[in-house]
Each structure stands twice: as C-alpha cells, then as structure tokens.
Regions:
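Multi-pass alpha-helical transporter architecture, strongest
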Residues: 195-224
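Extracytoplasmic gate region of multi-pass secondary transporters
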Residues: 28-87
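Intracellular juxtamembrane helix-capping segments at the cytosolic ends
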Residues: 139-152
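Structural signature of the two symmetry-related core transmembrane helices
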Residues: 100-115
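A membrane-interface helix-boundary motif in multi-pass transporters
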Residues: 183-198
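Intracellular cytosolic loops and amphipathic helices of Major Facilitator Superfamily
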Residues: 1-35, 218-227
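Helix-loop junctions at membrane interfaces in 12-TM secondary transporters
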Residues: 118-128
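Helix-to-loop junctions at the C-terminal end of transmembrane segments
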Residues: 86-97, 183
Length: 227
C-alpha cells in the first residue's frame, strides 16, 4: 500500500469476523459451554437420523412389496419434502425461533419415520408419509444451521458453525457403520430404519433444551467486539 501511496484508514471496520484466542476455549467458555454441547448433539444426531433414513428407506420399501421403480419413485418424495421445508422453514424460524421450530420438526419426524417402519400402507398414502418425513427430517438440517448462527456472537459465529458442522459430519460417517453393525447382529432393515427415530428423539430433546434455556447471542459492547 505504501508503493501505491495509499494510507490505511485507522480504526476502520473491515467487516471480518476474526476471533482471537483458542476457538474451542471460546466455545466452551462461560455462558456458552452448555449450548455448544447441546448444539453438537443436535448436529450429530440430526445427520445420524438423516443418513439412516436415506440409506435404508429404499430397502424397507422393497421389503414391503414394492418394485425397485416404485421404491425409487417413493423415495424421491423425501427430497421434495425437504425442498418444501426450506420454503417455509425460514419464516417459521423467524416467528418462533430456530430451536422451537426444530424441536417440533424432529418430534414430528419420529412419527412419520415410525409409521413407515411399522405400518403397511397403500402406495399413495406411503408416498405422502415419506414426503412429510423428508419435510420434517431432511429439511430440518437447514434450520439447524440457522440455530447455530443465532447462538453465538459475531466474533464466535464462524467457529461455532464450523465445529457444529464437523461434529455433524461425524454422525453422517457413523450412520452407515451403525447400520452395518446392526445388520450383522441380525436386525432386519425395518428395525434398523426404525432406530433412526431414536436419534431424532435425542435431537428433539436437545433443541427443546436450547429453547427452554433461551440462550441467545449476547449484545456486545464496542470494546468487547474489538477484543
């Protein structure tokens, strides 16, 4: 900048979210430790549930007597439900808060996944149930990202979201491993598919605890924001 004869502006706010210090220490610092643990549980269980749901749905449908083409077509309604969820979830989060909205979605997802695993249904009704299951479970992962963004102040937001996404990916990796292990124990695919409800339940409880705690990103003074 000296060669270009440009003098830097003293004290200018460049808009960068730069957190000083150890990011992990900040995430587990006073006022943030509990919400960080709960958020990590939400992300881990959310992707465990999502991948168990996605991997085993076609097999469950095939064992239910549907042809591979019918199973593939019915599975596609899961993605349509996820797309529809994105369209309205933002407004719902703005109105009720991300944690309350997600807790409700995970709880409803348990009902729809359990119905697919436990009950024989005609194809049309099954397609509708799969649509709502995808809307509640797959679409909620988008809302989980919004939850992470609202729990931390700006100086910690990048670290908070990044670590939560990383923990969630561990759940995505563990899901097929768990499915294979349960299969080796003699569990049938519908039973493995039903196990996804357990992770949805844990995610619902964790998001409900976040809502009950009512923790939000604190308002920082200019001096605190500059640290």
């Amino acid at each position: 900048m000296q060669q270009l004869d440009i003098a830097p502006v003293q004290g200018a706010d460049h808009g960068f979210d730069i957190a000083k210090g150890n990011p992990i220490a900040m995430l587990f610092g006073p006022g943030y430790a509990l919400q960080t643990v709960l958020l990590w549980i939400v992300f881990f269980c959310s992707l465990m549930n999502l991948f168990l749901f996605a991997y085993w749905l076609p097999e469950v449908l095939h064992l239910g007597g549907f042809t591979p083409a019918e199973a593939a077509r019915a599975s596609s309604y899961r993605d349509l439900g996820a797309i529809f969820a994105v369209l309205y979830l933002g407004a719902l989060i703005d109105r009720y808060g991300p944690d309350r909205a997600l807790a409700l979605h995970y709880a409803a997802g348990i009902i729809f996944i359990g119905a697919i695993a436990l009950f024989a249904m005609p194809y049309l009704l099954l397609s509708v149930v799969i649509f709502f299951a995808g809307m509640m479970i797959t679409g909620s992962q988008t809302g989980a990202n919004a939850t992470a963004g609202k729990l931390y102040p700006a100086r910690m937001r990048t670290s908070g979201i990044g670590w939560a996404l990383g923990i969630g990916r561990l759940g995505g990796i563990a899901a097929p491993v768990l499915g294979g292990y349960l299969l080796s124990l003699g569990m049938h695919p519908p039973q493995i598919f039903f196990s996804a409800c357990g992770f949805a339940l844990i995610a619902a409880i964790a998001t409900a605890l976040l809502a009950f705690r009512g923790q939000r990103a604190p308002v920082l003074t200019p001096q605190e924001a500059a640290e």
